[in-house]
Amino acid sequence: MEEIFDKLQAVADRYDELNELISDPEVIADSQRFMKLSKEEGSLRETVEKYNEYKEVTQTIKDDTEMLREESDPDLVEMTKEELNEAKERQAQLQDELEVLLIPKDPNDDKNIIMEIRGAAGGDEASLFAADLYNMYVRYAEKQGWNVEVVDRNETEVGGFKEIALIITGDQVYSKLKFENGAHRVQRIPATESAGRVHTSTATVGVMPEAEDVDVDLDPKDIRVDVYRSSGAGGQHINKTSSAVRMTHLPTGIVVAMQDERSQQQNRAKAMQILKARVYDYYQQQEQSEYDAQRKNAIGTGDRSERIRTYNYPQNRVTDHRIGLTLNKLDKIMAGDLEEIIESLIIADQAQKLEQLRNE
């Protein structure tokens, strides 16, 4: 526990430093820095409050133990023993709570997300499954009270999606959907399969936190913008005007094309929103070793090629391979009942991080 208390003291010292900084007129004048530091201060507050309470309770235990050695009055001894037992119970409770609070927090957990769903291996059936996943996430978002906005789509002739991109906004969206990153495999009999054979197809899901200006600063000189005529729906008007936009971030080579909106201005805004998220995601992977480790852990939140889940329609079964969870309610899950899977993933991730914390 000594290492944990060293970490707690470091958190308390940083909290005091932050309180001084956000009272500094120079920091207050810099709105972006002030917001960033205030957010950090708020994230540490509960930990510091519980740590201070832990120190008070520990002192109470020390004082009561000393008093019992010296006190002879029976009533006072009884009262002190009662107080000591309560203090020890509270100390143990606070110790458990502080360990959980020390688990490294994902700075993106409270962010909105950009989700990209693509049909992968399996042709038309993969595109249809991509559409099924889209509907599943929309229904889950509705249950959470979140808002879903489709910003780009590439539909297939059979009613599926080669690719669909959406922005999901609301409370703690990334914290709940970040574990959806990866390859989702479906096993079912396609409608066109006359022999009744089960086919296996795959769709990939990418989840990126929506980047704020404070997170990523894109230099306009680093962005090449091309405009061209949209090939999407919209009749004569959309083909006569150069409303589609392609943005290239030159330092990383990341390209975003947007033609879903009617006007070039709207497409520019959406393309920039997605470009920021992709660049932010790219730099987090490249530059932060801690973030890299988190993305490659046993729970898995990063690699889109990693097979994370299988949806078996004939047996009405869903299996999450990362935590060995199998649920026989595929019909409900596809209707947006994802809570049990998501909560299980969050608990497994926290348990793993707590184990790492104890072993450090």
From Swiss-Prot:
InterPro entries: PCRF, Pep_chain_release_fac_I, Pep_chain_release_fac_I_sf, Prokaryotic/Mito_RF, RF-1. One of its GO terms (cellular component) is cytoplasm. This is Peptide chain release factor 1. Pfam families: PCRF, RF-1. PANTHER family: LD18447P. One of its GO terms (molecular function) is translation release factor activity, codon specific. Peptide chain release factor 1 directs the termination of translation in response to the peptide chain termination codons UAG and UAA. The keyword Hydrolase does not apply. Belongs to the prokaryotic/mitochondrial release factor family. It comes from Limosilactobacillus fermentum (strain NBRC 3956 / LMG 18251). Keywords: Cytoplasm, Methylation, Protein biosynthesis. The modification N5-methylglutamine is found at residue 236.
